[in-house]
Each structure stands twice: as structure tokens, then as C-alpha cells.
Curated annotation (Swiss-Prot):
Domain of life: Bacteria
Zinc-finger is among the record's keywords: no
Function description: Channel that opens in response to stretch forces in the membrane lipid bilayer. May participate in the regulation of osmotic pressure changes within the cell.
Xref: HAMAP family: MscL
Record-linked PANTHER family: LARGE-CONDUCTANCE MECHANOSENSITIVE CHANNEL, MECHANOSENSITIVE CHANNEL MSCL
Record organism: Pectobacterium atrosepticum (strain SCRI 1043 / ATCC BAA-672) (Erwinia carotovora subsp. atroseptica)
Subcellular location: Cell inner membrane
UniProtKB keywords: Cell inner membrane, Cell membrane, Ion channel, Ion transport, Membrane, Transmembrane, Transmembrane helix, Transport
GO cellular component terms listed in the entry, alphabetical order: plasma membrane
Regions that span the bilayer: 10-30, 76-96
The keyword Iron-sulfur is assigned to this record: no
Main location class: membrane
Complexes and interactors: Homopentamer.
Stated name of the protein: Large-conductance mechanosensitive channel
Length: 136
């Protein structure tokens, strides 16, 4: 079997394709959440606590000295990333909760009775004929 054929079979298996779609959608969702946090949530929050831009919050550990740049701890960006994480984690929690609820519904739904085979139909007809003969 050629490597290309093996790779094609591997890549087209359901789980791999589903995983690829999930990664792509997850990356896009991550960008949306980052924008939501940095552009929508953090500005009003910063305004409420005194007009602070969270991206600019930092602690200078060592000032710049000549060509050596300053050593800065950007804790504002870290706070913003925590908000990103909390929103993504909550969205994933809700999605999994909904999926589990749908899965439970499917499991609770009784399976349809299988259609009788030709033999079962024939036996049922014979039974019905015998019942009719006994009544007469």
C-alpha cells in the first residue's frame, strides 16, 4: 500500500476529519472570545475601576539601562487572558452539557421494534388461521 493511499485513508476517517473541523472552529471561536474580552468587556470594566486600560497594567521590575530594555511584568495582559479562558471554559461547559442532554434523550428514546421477518409473518398468518378454525 502506498504512503499516499494510507495517508488518504487516515485523513478521511471520521474522527480525524471531525477533529480538524473542531480545531478550525475552535481557533475561530478563540479569536471571537479574545475580541469580546479585549474590545467589549475590558474597556467598561477598566472605566469602572478608574479609566484603566488593562493591556497597559504592568509592573516594572528593572528600568531600561542604555540599550538593555526594561524588565516588565505585564499582569494586565494576564488578567485579560484569564477572562478569555473563563469565557471559553464556560462556553465549552455549556456545549458539553447540551450534548450530554441530547445524548441522554437519544438513549431514553425506545428503539423501534424490528420489522417481522418473512417467517414471522407466515407464522402469524398460520396462527390467525388456526384461531379462526377454532372459533368455528
Amino acid at each position: 500500500m502506498s504512503i499516499i493511499k494510507e495517508f488518504r485513508e487516515f485523513a478521511m476517517r471520521g474522527n480525524v476529519v471531525d477533529l480538524a473541523v473542531g480545531v478550525i472552529i475552535g481557533a475561530a471561536f478563540g479569536k471571537i472570545v479574545s475580541s469580546l474580552v479585549s474590545d467589549i468587556i475590558m474597556p467598561p470594566l477598566g472605566l469602572l475601576i478608574g479609566g484603566v486600560d488593562f493591556k497597559q497594567l504592568s509592573l516594572i521590575l528593572r528600568d531600561a539601562q542604555g540599550e538593555i530594555p526594561a524588565v516588565v511584568m505585564n499582569y494586565g495582559a494576564f488578567i485579560q487572558n484569564i477572562f478569555d479562558f473563563v469565557i471559553v471554559a464556560f462556553a465549552i461547559f455549556i456545549a458539553i452539557k447540551l450534548m450530554n442532554k441530547m445524548r441522554r434523550k437519544q438513549e431514553d428514546t425506545p428503539a423501534a421494534a424490528p420489522k417481522p421477518s418473512a417467517e414471522e409473518k407466515l407464522l402469524a398468518e398460520i396462527r390467525d388461521l388456526l384461531k379462526e378454525q377454532h372459533k368455528q
